[in-house]
Regions:
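The feature captures the beta-strand-to-loop junction immediately N-terminal to the Walker
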Residues: 35-37
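Conserved ABC transporter NBD signature motif
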Residues: 58-66
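ABC ATPase NBD coupling module
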Residues: 66-80, 107-113
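Conserved ABC ATPase "signature" region
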Residues: 112-129
Length: 154
């Protein structure tokens, strides 16, 4: 379960709250959507979920783990984000997907990390692209690689 409970956020101690008592519950398999006018706090809420911004009060939890107190590595194992425009540089498709495993290994990937990546490549039918540079791919193919990287976080 993903739960936001009474989340409050403001940019400065003297400024008004951008988020004031936001609450939400999503059961496994449910999909949520954020809609709102400009300046409504969608990006601020999203940044709080990702751990980029720290709320003044309230909690964000996933499977009972308080994400507002979780380490970056713990959050990466529970929350994945696929931006609309992602930069890959000159990485190969395989290496780019492997980056999704960073929270699981230190300096080097283990055999288990390689198996996860290879299974995702097979599952998403990316075998023919695996050795190519992401910079050579179309926009849609890049988006697919970004999703594969998020899946590698498990």
């Amino acid at each position: 379960m993903f739960k936001i409970d009474n989340l409050c956020y403001r940019y400065k101690k003297t400024s008004p709250y951008v988020l004031d008592g936001v609450s939400l519950e999503l059961e496994k398999g449910e999909i949520g959507i954020m809609l709102g006018r400009n300046g409504a706090g969608k990006t601020t809420l999203f940044n709080s979920i990702l751990g980029i911004s720290r709320p003044v009060s309230g909690t964000i939890s996933y499977d009972g783990i308080d994400m507002t107190k979780a380490s970056r590595s713990q959050r990466a194992r529970k929350i994945a984000y696929v931006p609309q425009n992602i930069q890959f540089g000159t990485l190969s498709v395989y290496d780019s997907i492997m980056l999704g495993r960073l929270s699981y290994f230190g300096v080097r990937a283990a055999d288990s990390d390689r198996r996860v990546v290879e299974n995702i490549i097979k599952e998403m039918k990316l075998e023919e692209l695996a050795v190519r540079s992401v910079s050579e791919l179309s926009g849609g193919e890049r988006q697919k690689i970004a999703i594969a990287r998020a899946m590698a976080q498990q």
